Amino acid sequence: MINSFDFVSFLVIKQLCSLNYVNVDCFGKDVLKIVVSQLKIKNLNMSLVVVGSMAFDAIETPFGKSDKIIGGAATYIAWCASNFTPVKQISVVGGDFPQAELDALTARGVVLEGVQIKKDEKTFFWSGKYHLDMNTRDTLDTQLNVLENFQPVVPESYQDCEILMLGNLVPSVQSSVIKQMRNRPKLIVMDTMNFWMEIMMDDLKHTISLVDVLLVNDSEARQLSGEYSLVKAAKKIMEMGPKYVIIKKGEHGALLFHENEVFFAPALPLEEVFDPTGAGDTFAGGFVAHLAKTKDISFENMKTAIILGSAMASFCVEKFGTQRLTEINAEDIKARVASFVQLVNFDIELV
């Protein structure tokens, strides 16, 4: 996990320099320790609650094939976000879900009080096969199992939630979590998919009206809005309720919309992509984790958040399932973010 002192130090420097009180070069490590202790910064992060599936996946791509492996939206989000901030998880698994996986998440600072374990039932299972472009796929098998009758319960210890991340689930299940919050979170982020648009559009639009940020891919944005232009699509979706819309374009990056403003974050070009299954969820995990860590949900900070989300997603696709996310450390993340900075950093002079 990223060292909390490093992050606190960074925020202190950023705040003081932004007020023109000091130049960043004035600070040595010893001075930073004094500044941090004097400011007595406590509870740096906003409380993050993640809702979503924890599952088994079996995946086939043109470059390899996996047996039954750990997957699920909430799993990817938690593995990613826990690099930066504590996570409180809401999900459901069967008695066949490995205790070792639950223990590993707990060791990362993921609170599992909201995860229901149905010992006599089976965990949600999905199997899919990706085409050569790695953007389209065919579902080979879906077994809802415990997810079929999932009724999430928000524990009392989760009621301090400030950022709520709703992973892809039945829209009515997502909205039920919002209703259980005594105080509305400061930011509600929602992911969804085309399947719900095809079979329960009214329920989906109702849930969308309750959230602040909607995450969709480009084809879903067009289907939801009825517009081909992604700019027009985002505007129409914002009219449904969300203040912000993020349109994910896979290997081509992501777009962030707010009112009349647009921000584009590229995807890092990779030599090899083994499994894109959890990339969108990992992106979401990086996005909300940065907002929680910095306690800043402004549009300007969301720009940084989607860069971090893109960086984390670039790790996810390098191996099957959550494996790569379990291996990376703070130095890996810093190096990957630096690669993103170099990717888009340029000087231009008109002549």
What does each of the following model-derived ranges do?
Residues L44-E60:
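Positively charged, low-complexity intrinsically disordered leader regions
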Residues E101, V173-Q180, D202-H206:
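A short acidic, amphipathic alpha-helical/loop segment
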Residues F56-K68, N83-M165, K179-P185, K334-V351:
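Conserved N-terminal subdomain of the carbohydrate kinase-like
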Residues R182-L187, W196-F264:
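Conserved phosphate/ATP/ADP-binding segment of small-molecule kinases
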Residues A73-S82:
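Histidine-anchored nucleotide/phosphate-binding helix
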Residues L230-V351:
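Conserved phosphate-binding/catalytic region of the ribokinase-like
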Residues V8, V22-V24, V31:
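Short hydrophobic alpha-helical segments enriched in small aliphatic residues
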